[in-house]
């Protein structure tokens, strides 16, 4: 009887492990497909690259691994931090290297010197509210520093100082998600849609 119950317990544990792996893979697939909603938008050059899905996936992996409070979470946080910095760099360069200008937005060539005499609308509209959001450069830089410090630097420092200390994990997760909040806000606020050229 004991052997039967032990065998049944082993089978149950294997099934739980298998279900866990399947759910993990489905979660990653969901995150990837969500990220591709943004990555496939050619009208938003800062999103239109393969760093976008990589950033989404490692955001999830790094955040989830914090509960482990071990070196695996440090590695994932480090990869996430590098991807985030690269994403910001590419976002800053995105319109410089794109064949997009006021001319192409209006159907002319990039080299045409096109200037609007007046704004397209007298009042704000949906496109201006959703696609043309301006963030002052000095504020964006400050928010990036806050995001980077809270999402990567502090969590990594606390994990190194208190490895395996589960009570610290709540604090680490809280700090990390503050950084993620600012990072995600910038992801949308700094995105420059091609339609912005039409509105100068």
Q: Where does each model-flagged region fall?
A:
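Short alpha-helical interface elements
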Residues: 1, 50-57, 195-200
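Single conserved hydrophobic/aromatic residue that forms the stacking wall/gate
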Residues: 1-12
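Long, contiguous internal "core" modules enriched in hydrophobic/ aromatic residues
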Residues: 13-160, 164-180
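C-terminal structured interaction module
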Residues: 168-200
